[in-house]
Amino acid sequence: PIKPHWHYFMEIIYIFEGHAEVRSGSTVISAGRGDMALFHPKAVHSIFSDSPDDLRYGVIKLDINCINMTAENAPKFRSIFSFAEQRGMSIYFDNAQTEAIEASRIFENCIKEMQVRRYGYNDIIRSDISCLLVGVLRLWQESKFTIDSEVFADDGVYDIYNITEYIEEN
């Protein structure tokens, strides 16, 4: 079991085998094979096996501040995901949704790249994580989530916020 904790990073888990009770804040999810959950930065979350079967899942923990789209005119991932959190977008994605965004392949490839660590592995992992994040955004868009001017307005706010957070930590 992973007891309740939080950190400054985003975390995404993908269930490969078994069944788990996944909690984030007041949200409780019963997740099985092929399901995925996203924990926003600073969200208190936990994971407990809720079946006698072995639980096996992959974890991607990332600093959302360090992954951005390349287009200058695109809002930063951190602003989009913060906006989605404020709008209460689902942090749970079922097997059909994860198949649509190829989450299993992405997780397996990231794990393989981390194990082998051949030249450029970090670039491949960053690319795969970007694909996963865009996939999540597209799933949210199917649920009427829109990326509008409010998201762009937050880009500068988070720059100042991150600087003050860094100063506070040090």
Model-derived segments and spans:
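Generic protein-terminus/edge-of-domain signal
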Residues: 1-36, 43, 51, 74-79, ...
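Short intrinsically disordered, low-complexity coil segments enriched in acidic
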Residues: 1-6, 14, 38, 59, ...
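Residues immediately flanking
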Residues: 17, 41, 62-64
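A hydrophobic/aromatic-rich effector-binding and dimerization subdomain
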Residues: 48-112, 138-143
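Short, Lys/Arg-enriched, Trp-marked, Pro/Gly-tolerant hinge/linker segments that flank
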Residues: 91-99, 114-127, 133-170
